[in-house]
Amino acid sequence: MGGISIWQLLIIALIVVLLFGTKKLRSLGGDLGGAVKGFKNAMSSEEEKKALEENATDKPAADTAKVTETAKVAETAEKKAESKGKEQA
């Protein structure tokens, strides 16, 4: 029972509208919305930057894995060629 009821909130809202006017409240709401949108854009750009940095550090490891796999394939091909050469001789 210590909380604010819906009627009390409506009376407070009416007083605020009477004091500031609808134009001032509309511009204040637009400014607040623009600030929130700017904050969200800044946060998402920071997350994208971190993701790009993580991908940049992970990429050399992936390239190393490809080189290792290619080396294994080449080694297997050399062994097959050697065994064919021994069979023919």
Swiss-Prot record:
Pfam families: TatA_B_E. Residues 47-89 are annotated as: Disordered. The keyword Transport applies. The keyword Cell cycle does not apply. This is Sec-independent protein translocase protein TatA. One of its GO terms (biological process) is protein transport by the Tat complex. The chain crosses the membrane at residues 1-21. GO terms for cellular component: TAT protein transport complex. The Tat system comprises two distinct complexes: a TatABC complex, containing multiple copies of TatA, TatB and TatC subunits, and a separate TatA complex, containing only TatA subunits. Substrates initially bind to the TatABC complex, which probably triggers association of the separate TatA complex to form the active translocon. It comes from Shewanella pealeana (strain ATCC 700345 / ANG-SQ1). Part of the twin-arginine translocation (Tat) system that transports large folded proteins containing a characteristic twin-arginine motif in their signal peptide across membranes. TatA could form the protein-conducting channel of the Tat system. Belongs to the TatA/E family. It is found in: Cell inner membrane. It is a single-pass membrane protein. NCBIfam families: PRK02958.1, tatAE. It comes from the Bacteria. Residues 47-61, 75-89 have a biased composition (Basic and acidic residues). The gene is tatA. Residues 62-74 have a biased composition (Low complexity). Keywords: Cell inner membrane, Cell membrane, Membrane, Protein transport, Translocation, Transmembrane, Transmembrane helix, Transport. GO terms for molecular function: protein transmembrane transporter activity. InterPro entries: TatA/B/E (IPR003369), TatA/E (IPR006312).
